[in-house]
């Protein structure tokens, strides 16, 4: 009898643990109806809050934004608070995968920005810009009409992004000195 009580207790604890983990993880399905002409930002670095501030200040820009990166949800939540006009959704997955970009409704997006991704990097580490080129190729295979803006740190990657049909290529020293 004591053994049965122990087994039931362990089983109940395991079920409760699974249910709590699912509740904390949240529901990652998005309502497709509000995503049309929206902005998708892939990658995370120190310039994202400045970009969001510019978008928030521009009344003519879209207010629906999807952030796709592997940065911790708490960091993203703290960074995006205070943008009253913007409807920001975070997908915490690897943006180089086609399935993840489809989850962000890239085929319906107005603009897709690819930024150097500092997710999980130490302060002295540089982001892998091959991910930018790969993501641009993946995005164009999903939606040729999507406006892809790629941000690179190394000028040598510009030719690769041109071959990948990026609509705009941003090089920090040349384009965004105020960020």
Predicted feature descriptions by range:
Residues 1-179:
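Cytosolic regulatory regions of ion transport systems
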């Amino acid at each position: 009898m004591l053994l049965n009580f122990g087994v039931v207790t362990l089983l109940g604890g395991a079920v409760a643990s699974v249910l709590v983990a699912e509740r904390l993880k949240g529901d990652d399905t998005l309502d497709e109806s509000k995503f049309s002409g929206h902005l998708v930002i892939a990658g995370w670095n120190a310039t994202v809050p400045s970009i969001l501030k510019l978008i928030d200040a521009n009344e003519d820009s879209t207010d629906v934004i999807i952030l796709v990166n592997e940065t911790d949800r708490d960091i993203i939540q703290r960074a995006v608070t205070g943008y009253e006009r913007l409807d920001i959704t975070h997908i915490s997955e690897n943006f180089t995968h086609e399935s993840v970009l489809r989850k962000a409704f890239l085929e319906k997006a107005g603009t897709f920005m690819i930024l150097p991704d500092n997710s999980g990097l130490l302060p002295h580490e540089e982001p892998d810009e091959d991910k930018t080129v790969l993501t641009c190729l993946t995005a164009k295979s999903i939606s040729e009409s999507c406006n892809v803006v790629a941000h690179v740190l190394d000028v040598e990657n510009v030719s690769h992004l041109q071959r990948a049909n990026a609509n705009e290529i941003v090089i920090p020293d040349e384009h965004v000195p105020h960020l």
